[in-house]
Amino acid sequence: MILVDFWATWCGPCKMAMKQMKPMKKDLEGKDIVYVFIAGENSPKETWDNIIPDIHGEHYRVTAAQWKYLSKQFSIQGVPTYIIVDKEGAVIQKHTGFPGVDTVKKELMKALEK
């Protein structure tokens, strides 16, 4: 399963959510979950490079064209946006805005049970 986090370095709520989810990620360590973080090139590279070492997961900084494509494919209206993708590759949950750690953890646990 994959939790995709569309975010930006200049997005205060994005960074706050990452900090709040850190203990949850530790609790779920060893579970079959991959964390993917996607930021656009409107996030300055130097700032992005300084932030990502503290965030466990796979990190991608995409071009404006790639961001536009992903935004269209996943109907991204703003950041942060969270998408949970199941083992078959289906999007099973999407949130624009941080829904809270409890909600994210509950949805991940439910998806793991399938």
Briefly describe each language-model feature range:
Residues 6, 40, 87:
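Cofactor-binding loop segments of dinucleotide-utilizing enzymes, especially the Rossmann-like FAD-
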Residues 26-29, 109, 113:
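A general structural signal for alpha-helical elements within enzymatic catalytic domains
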Residues 9, 43, 90:
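Conserved Rossmann-like nucleotide-cofactor binding loop
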Residues 55, 62-112:
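Thiol/disulfide oxidoreductase modules built on the thioredoxin-like
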Residues 1-15, 21:
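Short active-site neighborhood of thiol/selenol oxidoreductases, capturing the structured segment around
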